[in-house]
Amino acid sequence: MGINNINKIPVRNNKISFVAVHLIKALTSKKQEKLVKLQRKKKIISVIKTWSRSSTIVPLMIGEIIAVHNGREHIPVYITEEMVGFKLGEFATTRIWRGHLKKTTHKKNNKTYGLYF
């Protein structure tokens, strides 16, 4: 390789990424191959449910739909190439933003109270 080709070399991270064992089994099992054949015939979408938000997205997961638990429900996440290296939990938010409090003044003593809506 010459100096001109240095920019084309992919940079690899030496850290070991965690992936839950049940996710690897679900992605590589023979059942998955059978489901792929059924998907082509009947247009069935297979979703893999997981509670493992700390699992890293690996290239094996590209094109799959993984339902990530956010504490209340499973959020379906379609895995793309740009997501590789991130954690599954980053794509299923756990908190709901309800905005800032609305402040009102009462006529009796002119104090300001925060009201929750």
UniProtKB/Swiss-Prot annotation:
InterPro entries of this UniProt entry? Ribosomal_uS19, Ribosomal_uS19_bac-type, Ribosomal_uS19_CS, Ribosomal_uS19_SF
Key words of the record: Plastid, Ribonucleoprotein, Ribosomal protein, RNA-binding, rRNA-binding
Tell me, in one coarse class, where this protein mainly resides.
plastid
Localization per Swiss-Prot or TrEMBL = Plastid
Q: Which GO terms describe its biological process?
A: ribosomal small subunit assembly; translation
**Cystine residue pairs:** none
| Pfam families to which the protein is assigned, alphabetical | Ribosomal_S19
GO CC annotations? mitochondrial small ribosomal subunit; plastid
What are this entry's molecular-function GO terms?
Answer: rRNA binding; structural constituent of ribosome
Which superkingdom, per the lineage? Answer: Eukaryota
Query: Do you know which NCBIfam families this protein is assigned to?
Result: rpsS_bact
Family to which this protein belongs: Belongs to the universal ribosomal protein uS19 family.
Q: What does this protein do?
A: Protein S19 forms a complex with S13 that binds strongly to the 16S ribosomal RNA.
| The protein's name | Small ribosomal subunit protein uS19c
Q: Which gene encodes it?
A: rps19
